[in-house]
């Protein structure tokens, strides 16, 4: 994947970059693996805003992704690498030898025509899915399960990667993208390799309209609101926050407060917390 930088022919084009989509080999998705989805614009069933700054955006079809990878000992051929508007990573279309078609997250360097498979006896190569107990230490992995059979939940964004550090009884030590080291059941599955489209984070949208295409609405600063709308609001001119430290719109401290529940049951599985946490 290469980054295209546009000439500043207009203010919106200045500093705008995009992907060249050189890895994409198929434009139209597989119809049997599509589902319609409705956008709620951040509202719940009562019509109340539960997530701010969402709404609009281009209409999208949801691609059904196989995060479980539980078709053991059945080989599949990569037929295409496709764009998925619902995620940052690209997806790969697989044709299994028994006639089943499926989408998976496209790992880095996965090519059309590559044969992939799942199961404890699969080879250690990008795109293959194995239980953590069958993956040697030092191997890069992604799409990691937290509960056996539930499907991958960790390391699914573009360019992310985790690493197997070793086995410890019924658990496997894994270092995540954030630097966190945690225990995961060795019967959980993961896919070999790192997630592709690794230069996604380098893309600059360049203009507000491109953000609106993604379904993201503008965000106003609290300091320009009225005092009944935000703790930072009110005052004459450019007034300071007026509090000991910045606050969220709901009056809670927004800096330096831990958001993780220290009494969570999974806390005992974390060997080392992510970078920045002590």
UniProtKB/Swiss-Prot annotation:
<dbReference type="GO" id="GO:0016740">
    <property type="term" value="F:transferase activity"/>
</dbReference>
<dbReference type="GO" id="GO:0019843">
    <property type="term" value="F:rRNA binding"/>
</dbReference>
<feature type="compositionally biased region" description="Basic residues">
    <location>
        <begin position="252"/>
        <end position="263"/>
    </location>
</feature>
<dbReference type="InterPro" id="IPR022671">
    <property type="entry name" value="Ribosomal_uL2_CS"/>
</dbReference>
<keyword id="KW-0694">RNA-binding</keyword>
<feature type="compositionally biased region" description="Basic residues">
    <location>
        <begin position="210"/>
        <end position="219"/>
    </location>
</feature>
<dbReference type="Pfam" id="PF03947">
    <property type="entry name" value="Ribosomal_L2_C"/>
</dbReference>
<dbReference type="InterPro" id="IPR012340">
    <property type="entry name" value="NA-bd_OB-fold"/>
</dbReference>
<comment type="function">
    <text>One of the primary rRNA binding proteins. Required for association of the 30S and 50S subunits to form the 70S ribosome, for tRNA binding and peptide bond formation. It has been suggested to have peptidyltransferase activity; this is somewhat controversial. Makes several contacts with the 16S rRNA in the 70S ribosome.</text>
</comment>
<dbReference type="InterPro" id="IPR014726">
    <property type="entry name" value="Ribosomal_uL2_dom3"/>
</dbReference>
<comment type="subunit">
    <text>Part of the 50S ribosomal subunit. Forms a bridge to the 30S subunit in the 70S ribosome.</text>
</comment>
<dbReference type="InterPro" id="IPR008991">
    <property type="entry name" value="Translation_prot_SH3-like_sf"/>
</dbReference>
<keyword id="KW-0699">rRNA-binding</keyword>
<comment type="similarity">
    <text>Belongs to the universal ribosomal protein uL2 family.</text>
</comment>
<dbReference type="InterPro" id="IPR005880">
    <property type="entry name" value="Ribosomal_uL2_bac/org-type"/>
</dbReference>
<dbReference type="GO" id="GO:0003735">
    <property type="term" value="F:structural constituent of ribosome"/>
</dbReference>
<dbReference type="InterPro" id="IPR014722">
    <property type="entry name" value="Rib_uL2_dom2"/>
</dbReference>
<dbReference type="InterPro" id="IPR022666">
    <property type="entry name" value="Ribosomal_uL2_RNA-bd_dom"/>
</dbReference>
<keyword id="KW-0687">Ribonucleoprotein</keyword>
<dbReference type="GO" id="GO:0002181">
    <property type="term" value="P:cytoplasmic translation"/>
</dbReference>
<protein>
    <recommendedName>
        <fullName>Large ribosomal subunit protein uL2</fullName>
    </recommendedName>
</protein>
<dbReference type="InterPro" id="IPR002171">
    <property type="entry name" value="Ribosomal_uL2"/>
</dbReference>
<dbReference type="GO" id="GO:0015934">
    <property type="term" value="C:large ribosomal subunit"/>
</dbReference>
<dbReference type="Pfam" id="PF00181">
    <property type="entry name" value="Ribosomal_L2"/>
</dbReference>
<feature type="region of interest" description="Disordered">
    <location>
        <begin position="210"/>
        <end position="278"/>
    </location>
</feature>
<dbReference type="InterPro" id="IPR022669">
    <property type="entry name" value="Ribosomal_uL2_C"/>
</dbReference>
<keyword id="KW-0689">Ribosomal protein</keyword>
């Amino acid at each position: 994947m290469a980054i295209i930088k546009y000439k500043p022919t207009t203010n919106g084009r200045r500093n705008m970059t995009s992907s060249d989509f050189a890895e994409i080999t198929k434009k139209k998705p597989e119809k049997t693996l599509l589902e319609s989805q409705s956008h709620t614009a951040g509202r719940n069933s009562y019509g109340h805003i539960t997530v701010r700054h969402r709404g609009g955006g281009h209409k999208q079809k949801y691609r059904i992704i196989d995060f479980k990878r539980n078709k053991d000992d059945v080989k599949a051929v990569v037929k295409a690498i496709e764009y998925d508007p619902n995620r940052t990573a690209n997806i790969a279309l697989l044709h299994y030898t028994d006639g089943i078609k499926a989408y998976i997250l496209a790992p880095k360097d996965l090519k059309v025509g590559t044969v992939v498979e799942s199961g404890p006896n699969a080879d250690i190569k990008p795109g293959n899915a194995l239980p953590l107990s069958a993956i040697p230490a030092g191997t890069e992995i992604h799409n990691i399960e937290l509960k056996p059979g539930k499907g991958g939940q960790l390391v699914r964004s573009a360019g992310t990667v985790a690493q197997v550090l070793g086995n410890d009884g019924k658990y496997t030590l894994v270092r995540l993208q954030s630097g966190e080291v945690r225990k995961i059941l060795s019967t959980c599955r993961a896919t070999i390799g790192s997630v592709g489209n690794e230069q996604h984070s380098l893309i600059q949208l360049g203009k507000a309209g491109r953000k609106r295409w993604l379904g993201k609405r503008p965000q106003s600063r609290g300091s320009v609101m009225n005092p009944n709308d935000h703790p930072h609001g009110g005052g004459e001119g450019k007034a300071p926050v007026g509090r000991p430290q910045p606050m969220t719109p709901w009056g809670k401290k927004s800096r330096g407060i831990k958001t993780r529940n220290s009494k969570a049951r999974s806390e005992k599985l974390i060997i080392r917390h992510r970078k920045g946490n002590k």
